[in-house]
């Protein structure tokens, strides 16, 4: 039989609009025949479970058991051979084949099946058996069309290779690309692991506002909106930090939140304006405790998502099982600058003029608002970002950040101008940021004032003065450590994804042309 559905669904030789028109005609006939989209079928098994339970049985052993099953899914493969046919359906767990002929289900049902298309949702019922080639299959005694597909799927030879289409039509990507389904299953497992470990450590999960009257908790440019009922300007949150610390003030000594943040900034393989973060705060801890705890979280997430802490990322081994190294900013510059073709002496890194010259050589503008009046600590950080950051492949904590770039972090008791802060880098990407929290209300107010001065001088990412947060601190906050982990970047590591859009189900794209 010449079955059109056996041809590749989308090729240069076949016009997609013509295929859609043909399928609409088929749907119209189904509507005339009764219920075109029935909703009264309940599967008894998933494809993967059937393979797990019965793949090991011989053909004879399986036949003796007479195992009756009901399965349903999207038809992704179809072979019609006269009076017999084979097809494969795909459910959320995997794929399974079924066999149909005129005798088993009746010539009318088999005849109707021959006109069904790839992408249609089908239910099948019958006994399990194994083909002569040993493939587990369902011997179909009852077959129904549950949902008609109007658009053809990409053919298996060409797949869905256009990245923009892949991101924009994620539903098609998930249908045809098992790698994408695997990525998002791993993402779900990793987040579940993080949540489980937080709860096991006696943290309480909370939800804080997405709309803020004042943007705060990070240095970033916010999205702005308007609250009609209150007639006031609002900001999509750039970070939940200040609200979570209010909860610590209120007596919830261990809190965490996994949710979205929004930053009205650039899009790149590492940045998406809407992204997922986990932030957590623990009273009576400091940044060293946080580093130990965060290291354990990430290692456990890797094992729970991928079964191992030793991964391969972009062709290179990434070992999360070893202790994460810890370096100061200047130690990291001296250790890694050679990979950027640079060589420095420790004394040079204490010379502000020298660093400004090096920044200019690297294409940075030392007179930009963020650097024009910068102290030595901020300049060292800028040089680190220029010559060392991208080379931090193995997990590395960069510690002891300057106070001028850490307005919410506690200052060191022994090193004036340095805060008890860290950032975690893996494969050259920032994955986490944490510190011993500043709980001195007067010190925090002074730092907010300096941030306002920087904003007035042209730094768009400087923080606002949050009077209510200061009021909260004035009631007293216990010594506290807090950390934020970038979930999307973490998933990139765990799934070997080169682009952040590969791990976000529906990333932002330019408006689609009509």
Curated annotation (Swiss-Prot):
Binds 3 Mg(2+) ions per subunit. The keyword Aminoacyl-tRNA synthetase applies. Mg(2+) 1 binds at residues 423, 430. Its cofactor is Mg(2+). This is Lysine--tRNA ligase. The keyword Zinc does not apply. GO terms for molecular function: ATP binding; lysine-tRNA ligase activity; magnesium ion binding; tRNA binding. InterPro entries: Aa-tRNA-synt_II (IPR004364), aa-tRNA-synth_II (IPR006195), aa-tRNA-synth_II/BPL/LPL (IPR045864), Lys-tRNA-ligase_II (IPR002313), Lys-tRNA-ligase_II_N (IPR044136), Lys-tRNA-synth_II_C (IPR018149), NA-bd_OB-fold (IPR012340), NA-bd_OB_tRNA (IPR004365).
């Amino acid at each position: 039989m010449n079955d059109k559905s056996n041809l590749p669904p989308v090729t240069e030789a076949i016009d997609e609009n013509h295929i859609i028109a043909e399928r609409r005609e088929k749907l119209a006939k189904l509507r005339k025949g009764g219920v075109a989209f029935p909703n009264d079928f309940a599967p008894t098994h998933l494809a993967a479970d059937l393979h797990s339970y019965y793949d090991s049985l011989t053909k004879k052993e399986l036949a003796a058991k007479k195992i009756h099953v009901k399965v349903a899914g999207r038809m992704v493969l179809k072979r019609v051979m006269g009076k017999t046919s084979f097809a494969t359906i795909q459910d959320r767990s995997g794929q399974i084949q079924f066999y149909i002929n005129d005798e088993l289900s009746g010539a009318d049902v088999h005849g109707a099946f021959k006109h069904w298309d790839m992408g249609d949702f089908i239910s099948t019922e019958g006994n399990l058996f194994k083909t002569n080639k040993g493939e587990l299959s369902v011997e179909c005694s009852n077959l129904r069309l549950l949902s008609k597909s109007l658009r053809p799927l990409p053919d298996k030879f060409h797949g869905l290779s256009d990245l923009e289409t892949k991101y924009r039509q994620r539903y098609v990507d998930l249908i045809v690309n098992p790698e994408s389904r695997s990525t998002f299953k791993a993402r779900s497992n990793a987040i579940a692991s993080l949540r489980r470990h937080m709860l096991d450590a006696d943290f309480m999960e909370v939800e804080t506002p997405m709309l803020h009257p004042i943007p705060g908790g990070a240095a970033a440019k916010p999205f702005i909106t308007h609250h009609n009922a209150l007639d006031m300007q609002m900001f999509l949150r750039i970070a939940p930090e200040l609200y979570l610390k209010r909860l610590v003030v209120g007596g919830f000594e261990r809190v965490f939140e996994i949710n979205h943040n929004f930053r009205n900034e650039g899009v790149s393989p590492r940045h998406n304006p809407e992204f997922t973060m986990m932030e957590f705060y623990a009273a009576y801890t400091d940044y060293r405790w946080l580093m130990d705890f965060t290291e354990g979280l990430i290692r456990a997430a890797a094992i729970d998502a991928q079964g191992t802490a030793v991964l391969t990322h972009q062709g290179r081994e990434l070992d999360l099982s070893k202790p994460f190294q810890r370096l100061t900013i200047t130690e990291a510059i001296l250790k890694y600058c050679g990979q950027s073709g640079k060589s420095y002496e420790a004394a040079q890194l204490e010379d502000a003029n020298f660093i400004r010259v090096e920044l200019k050589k690297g294409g940075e503008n030392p007179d930009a608002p963020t650097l024009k009046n910068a102290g030595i600590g901020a300049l060292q950080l800028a040089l680190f970002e220029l010559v060392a950051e991208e080379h931090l492949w193995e997990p590395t904590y960069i510690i002891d950040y300057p106070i001028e770039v850490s307005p919410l972090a506690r200052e060191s008791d022994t090193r004036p101008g340095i805060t008890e802060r860290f950032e975690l880098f893996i494969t050259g990407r920032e994955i986490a940021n944490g510190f011993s929290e500043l709980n001195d209300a007067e010190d925090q107010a002074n730092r907010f004032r300096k941030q306002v001065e920087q904003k007035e001088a042209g730094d768009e990412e400087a923080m606002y003065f949050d009077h209510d947060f200061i009021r909260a601190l004035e009631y007293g906050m216990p010594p506290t450590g807090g950390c934020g982990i970038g979930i999307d970047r973490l998933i990139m590591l765990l799934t070997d994804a080169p682009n952040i859009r590969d791990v976000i189900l529906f990333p932002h794209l330019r408006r689609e042309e009509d």
